[in-house]
A protein has these predicted regions:
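Conserved class I S-adenosyl-L-methionine
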Residues: 123-133
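S-adenosylmethionine
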Residues: 182-263
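Non-catalytic substrate-recognition/targeting regions of SAM-dependent transferases
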Residues: 6-20, 27-103, 110
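S-adenosyl-L-methionine
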Residues: 154-200
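C-terminal catalytic and target-recognition region of SAM-dependent MTase-like enzymes
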Residues: 236-300
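Conserved alpha-helix/loop element of class I SAM-dependent methyltransferases that forms part
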Residues: 103-122
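Conserved SAM-binding motif I beta-strand of class I
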Residues: 147-152
Length: 300
């Protein structure tokens, strides 16, 4: 396989769908927010694996291969590898239309590596990564010197992340693999007086913890964010929150954190779009993120 055919590429998007290449396989699947016309209509003929459904998580959604591709659906459903920036990641089609990675998160990696390398000059950089899924960002941060606690409530996601670590030659990096509910674990870490320099979280709109605990972002995010902020050390880098469905503004969250700590004007927020750029230079919006950075030292 040629090296240029091993990575990720957003080829085109439009009419509610996106055309992507993961390694050697071209995939056509739904994309929320992709309602512009397609820029390269002829490119869609190259799709080999297609998710049939008007949206992700469709109850009637299913994967099919195009008749022209010559691909075998059963073989593709077993998975294949995609290389990106030194990492080898396992791609496995899910019944929800997901593939096990969120490429829009990779635009944060340069900021992670810079922040970690700057942080290491002051001491160890401990990262708590919540809702960490299959681990591409955990692996990126570990490969740049961080000690990472990778946590997800789904055992199969953590097992998948460990496979990605092995495929990437990073199984010996300082990564702790935890299957647990994010809120339960953060609260327990507070009781243990554990501290981290960086907390990263990508919560879903809805979900369930390891023991069936219900998660609803509009109900549970603020209390979790308060715990995350309290877990920061005196050498804190901050808290990074990404989501496809935030229902609260950066200003409101900052005010909640300041209220919880009893300190004002001590938190800086940076809002950034989460997006992918296609071959024509167009941006597909995929949500947004917020960085919460301490102003001055952290006092507990």
């Amino acid at each position: 396989m040629n090296s240029e055919r091993q990575g990720y590429e957003l080829i085109d998007f439009g009419e509610g769908r996106k055309l992507e290449r993961f390694g050697s396989i071209t995939v056509d699947r739904p994309a929320r927010g992709a309602w512009t016309p397609k820029a390269i209509p002829e490119a869609w003929e190259s799709a080999e694996l297609i998710y049939r459904g008007e949206r992700m998580n469709a109850s009637d959604g299913s994967w099919q291969v195009s008749s022209e591709s010559g691909r075998n659906l059963d073989e593709l459903m077993k998975g294949w590898e995609c290389k990106t920036r030194g990492l080898n990641l396992q791609i496995i089609p899910q019944r929800t239309g997901q593939l096990g990675v969120f490429p829009e998160h990779w635009s944060l990696w340069d900021w992670y590596s810079r922040s970690i390398q700057e942080g290491i000059t002051r001491g160890p950089v401990r990262v708590l990564h919540l809702f960490a899924y299959t681990g591409s960002s955990s692996l990126w941060m570990a490969s740049h010197g961080a000690m990472v606690t990778h946590l997800d409530a789904m055992k199969h996601a953590v097992d998948w992340a460990r496979v990605n670590a092995k495929l990437s030659g990073l199984e010996d990096k300082p990564i702790r693999w935890i299957v647990e509910d994010a809120r339960r674990y953060a609260a327990r870490e507070l009781k243990r007086n554990s501290l981290y320099e960086l907390v990263v979280l990508d919560p879903p709109s809805y979900g369930h913890g390891r023991n069936g605990e219900a998660w609803e972002i509009h109900r549970d995010l603020v209390s979790l964010m308060k715990d995350c902020w309290q877990l920061l050390s005196e050498n804190a880098i901050g808290v990074v929150l990404t989501s496809h469905s935030l229902n609260i503004s950066a200003k409101e969250l900052r005010m909640e954190l300041e209220l919880a700590t009893g300190k004002t004007n001590r938190i800086q927020t940076v809002v950034f779009p989460s997006f992918l750029e296609d071959c024509s230079g167009r941006r597909l919006e995929c949500g947004e993120g917020i960085r919460f950075e301490p102003v001055g030292s952290m006092d507990h």
